[in-house]
Amino acid sequence: LAALLALSRQHRDKASIDALNLTALDREIKAARETAAGEGLVAVNIMKAVAEHPLLVRQACASGADAIVMGAGLPLDLPELTADYPKMALIPILSDARGIGLLIKKWLRKGRLPDAIVIEHPRYAGGHLGAARIEDLNDSRFDFDNVLSQTRQLLHDLQIEPEQIPLICAGGINTPQQVRQLLANGASAVQLGSAFAVSEEGDAHPEFKRVLAEAKAEDIVEFMSVAGLPARGVMTPWLKNYLKRESLLQSKARCGAERCAAGLHCLTVCGLRDGLAKFGQFCIDSQLAAAMRGEISKGLFFRGASRLPFGEAIRPVRELIEYMLLGRWPAALSGGQACITASG
């Protein structure tokens, strides 16, 4: 990784950066497969909003990934991009029944069904959110019960057996009671993001983990990303300063390639580069990279809204899984099990 980063500093043109990204992705997938030793699946999460998502999808297929997970937009082109790899599992991330219906009907015309669907609740999830506006995040159409029941009806109307498309709920899930309730209501599985990001085994910077784990409810905010989607993260010094200036920056938005601070043109549509006044006005690549390095003063730290299962404690993955699936609270955490609700 260090060698690739050094090369990226020497060659700043887009073609070179894209090639280095593909090399890095290839290495990570092969390393993951080696570690997995034939157990489980190796999946790659790719944002639809990323300009070179077709290249990344094709590289993931060629490198031996088992599944592609895609959100941050409707991944209507995934069947075409993976046509040469019919065994590749395709898992879109969506938030409401309308989007699910649109995608399934489009894919059916291409002779493909999703291998699973992640239903991500924008009221609770971290990062980019599946709503058009911040004002929509609490809309009841995103509630898991509504989406699950409406999707089951959709599958029935399309004569698709429910077992053909497992539904995976994501966002704000932090207790075994929630897991059991969702499974009882028709979910096939659940997905956790922030909780695993701060696990002992997670390879994130220690400061990255600390920022996520120690964030209080009042520290977590929603704002518009440069990708044109609402996003949720921790109110770090950088984000606090940016939000103070957001209206001013948006009023001065203008289109120009030189506005791309990193020169990467990483997004298909970018509020900063393309002069879109209703979008965010910052370089998301630079801010996320700073977070990756653990730079609290400069980083953008995406995080879900709810309290983490173990609060501020950073614990092993095994303990997290045992708690969420079996209700077994870690003996090492003093004071007994905390009272946790979906709203944090």
Task: State what each model feature region is.
Residues 124-144, 148-164, 168, 174-344:
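Conserved active-site-proximal phosphate/metal-binding subdomains
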